[in-house]
């Protein structure tokens, strides 16, 4: 929802970056990224707008089905045999169990607009107090010296 519904349009399409997204790790860490981004300063401001985007989008009362299906698709992608082996290796190394996978799927399928809206405030705190790292040419990151 955030990566393709908001960041892609604001940072990739309008801002000209080659790519962008948001990721939430199982330990609760949240990070946003862009790459080959000609306007890093704008992208940082866009990341700060994620809570408002969520609030506005979810207030429209749209069905959650497409969002849930898209999320399941990212957690259970179609894979060839080599991809299955790679995924199982990663799960083994991370200690991810079948019970973990089932729990995550239940949480995804049980997602509601209200539950997503509750994430807006922690994301707002992240945007206001989070750390960032910018790697680029001297001109691309000159705004950091302001």
PLM features per residue range, with description:
Residues 1-46, 106-127, 146:
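Non-catalytic beta-strand/loop surface segments
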Residues 11, 51-53, 104:
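Bulky hydrophobic/aromatic packing residues
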Residues 68, 72-146:
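C-terminal regions of mature proteins
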């Amino acid at each position: 929802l955030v990566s393709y519904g908001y960041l892609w349009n604001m940072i990739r399409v309008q801002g000209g970056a080659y790519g962008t997204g948001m990721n939430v790790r199982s330990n609760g860490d949240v990070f946003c990224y862009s790459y080959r981004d000609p306007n890093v300063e704008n992208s940082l401001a866009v990341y700060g707008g994620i809570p408002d985007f969520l609030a506005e989008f979810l207030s429209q009362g749209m069905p959650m089905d497409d969002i849930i299906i898209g999320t399941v698709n990212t957690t259970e992608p179609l894979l060839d045999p080599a991809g299955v082996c790679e995924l199982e290796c990663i799960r083994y190394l991370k200690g991810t169990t079948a019970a973990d996978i089932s729990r995550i799927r239940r949480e995804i399928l049980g997602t509601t607009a209200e539950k997503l809206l509750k994430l807006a405030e922690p994301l707002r705190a992240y945007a206001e107090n989070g750390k960032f790292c910018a790697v680029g040419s001297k001109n691309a990151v000159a705004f950091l010296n302001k």
